[in-house]
Amino acid sequence: DGTLWQSRIMVGRPYRSTPMLRSEINRLTFNPTWTVPPTILREDMLPMIRKDPDYLTREDIEVISLSGAPLDPRQIDWWHPGNLLLRQRAGPHNALGRVAIRFPNRHDVYLHDTPAQGLFNLDRRAISSGCIRVANALELARLLLDDEKKWNQAAIDELVASGLTREVALARRVPLILYYWTVAVDAEGVVSFRPDIYQRDAAVLAALNRPLAAAAPSH
């Protein structure tokens, strides 16, 4: 019982909200690559590529076909790119940082590290595209692996330093709940109120105030 570990996080912007869900964490990816999701490709990446021909090189992003074959970005009409994928190579500037923490879900979201650690100092951190960025993510990874002989901090640091991408399955899945609460009570009974960043409180309040349906007559 009680809190074993806690950390600051960043969640999705209001127009790319982090979903509510239940799942189980089942694997970790150290030194992950990042395949850019279609929405981010269309709304964020393409405008930047059109403005700056060096953007892909600077961000260490490769262009590949749907089958995984490399494509030459100089040969692509970025106003009509067709079917392709952008994949950011593993490394210190990768958007997922040094580890991604994965669990089955239909939204294709996950927890992950980030190279932009300074953003955790912001008071309002609804700035991601739906996934959850976690401060001290490598520490969380060590706790999830729960194997101090094989996966102590030194072993994790060595793997990260190698730069090699590696998938590690958890010996025991860890339950995960993503919820959205704008009111919370801490262990001392202190109530705190948070901004309703996704504008959901009005619908919840309306549902709570709705009269209960009349009970069906018994026979």
Spans of features found by a protein language model:
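Well-ordered beta-sheet/strand-loop patches within structured domains
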Residues: 1-219
